[in-house]
Amino acid sequence: IVSGSAVSLLFGGANCMMMQFRGRLFLVGDLSALRTAVNVAGTYSLDISAAFVLAALLSLVGCLLAISLGGKPDLGKKERLVTRGAALACAGIYTMAVFYGGIFETNGIRLTWNENDFEESPVLYFVESIRSMNVDQPEGYSKEALAAISAESALPVGGKKPHVIAIMNEAFSDLRRIGDFETNVEITPFIDGLTENTVRGAVYSSVFGGSTANSEFELLTGMTMAFIPKGAAPYQSYIKYEKDSLVSVLEAQGYTSAALHPYDASGWNREAVYDCFGFDEVRFIDEFQNKRYLRGYVTDESNFENLIGRYEARNEGERLFLFNITMQNHGSYKSESYESTVSISGHEGEFPQAEQYLSLLRETDKAVNELI
């Protein structure tokens, strides 16, 4: 009873946190992201519901009663063997059906999020996520098939080798694409005005509310999260050895590669992954110069100054591939020490998190202006 109550309470708490911060249930893949979650936990605030407090109190009362009543059931050796044998048999049947028999898929049940999951089947949802962690080879996959696709889409190779600077701006998005609203000031006037010598468009993200490294994985490898189990983090689960990527492709053409990220090296196992990708240089927060902070994160302006510094320090004739992951706009958006500069017209102060987020994007726009 005691151990069962503890496990149930921890599982329930994990689901409550995931619902608040990610808008979905707790999956087995989230266990591998625990260290990353701890790194950024200080910027989030958890709203503990009365229902969770009540559940914790009831669990505590149940444990105390179980301990005080104590004692073991008066069963003979034969009864104990039968009971344990039956329990093992049930566990074995359940394990075979769920993990090896694909009972959910056989009956047309897919592991997809819907609003009823939280109320009806969080445990089933978690258990099925364990089975789905094994990645199956897609149908029709082969080196020959890849070569054929490559031949069809091949573009003529030019003689120029420009410097390549790829910046993935943390949590940056255009909310105007999903809602019609006006603000007291323009949010991203410089970025919106980029037209000359510019190719632009919308990019759909495979993640929402977290799992930044999954978008990073897609960019650097050209692979898609469509074939990765829901809730999994490739950086922590699948990249364990040297892997072809944009890094290796450019290095084969004579480029020097460098990854810059103004945060801890432990986040999403980046230090080990960048080594597998073969980056020539890797810089995390300890190696950034003249750091300035906003809500506890290095500002984009300060980040870009370090990026410019590495570019200007290049050797004569050296071609660079600089890969930069920013941190300024990371959640949460409840900082009381930050005064928002953007307000939603007609709804001033009604959506403080949205206004703080939009204000941060405005700061990014200014930094991009200085960078370019």
Task: Please identify what each model-predicted range represents.
Residues 1-116:
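Transmembrane and membrane-interface helices of multi-pass
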Residues 4, 27-31, 120, 355-365:
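Short, well-ordered coil↔helix boundary/capping segments
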Residues 17, 44-48, 64, 71-72, ...:
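Short secondary-structure junctions and interdomain/linker hinges
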Residues 27, 49, 121, 142-143, ...:
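Helix N-terminus capping/helix-initiation residues
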Residues 31-34, 119-126, 188, 213-216, ...:
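Alpha-helix initiation and N-capping motif
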Residues 39-56, 122, 126-130, 134, ...:
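Membrane-interface transmembrane-helix boundary segments in multi-pass integral membrane proteins
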Residues 98-167, 179:
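Membrane-interface segments at or immediately adjacent to transmembrane helices
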Residues 150-160, 166-169, 174-372:
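Solvent-exposed soluble domains appended to multi-pass membrane proteins
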